[in-house]
């Protein structure tokens, strides 16, 4: 509960009432949409690997229900452990995408710095996360 109070107090103090409400909604909505996207992506990837058509509801549930059960058991793990991996994976995805875009722009003689500089920055962030965060407990 302490984290919720910190978010509430700091959002209202720094952003005012309206900005604070938007910030608090963002803290609630963004993790929910990330979870929704993760479940959808996992379901579609599994369906593609096993060639399961996803047009009918029963076939969607065939894959979704086991994923939800797995998600339930994962949610019983300490949130700080889950968050550690989520933030790392999120930053790594951004880094790979930025370097891919930078490579594409460079190859076709476009202004690649628009992607290269942020890619360099996020690579530094990822390196710092990996060096300062204990991703695997000993």
Curated annotation (Swiss-Prot):
Segments traversing the membrane: 12-32, 62-82, 111-131
Keyword entries, A-Z: Cell membrane, Membrane, Transmembrane, Transmembrane helix
Localisation: Cell membrane
Membrane topology: Multi-pass membrane protein
Keyword Cell membrane recorded: yes
Keyword presence, Membrane: yes
GO cellular component labels: plasma membrane
Chief place of localization: membrane
Coiled coil: none
The protein's name in its UniProt record: Uncharacterized protein HI_1127
Organism: Haemophilus influenzae (strain ATCC 51907 / DSM 11121 / KW20 / Rd)
Source lineage: Bacteria, Pseudomonadati, Pseudomonadota, Gammaproteobacteria, Pasteurellales
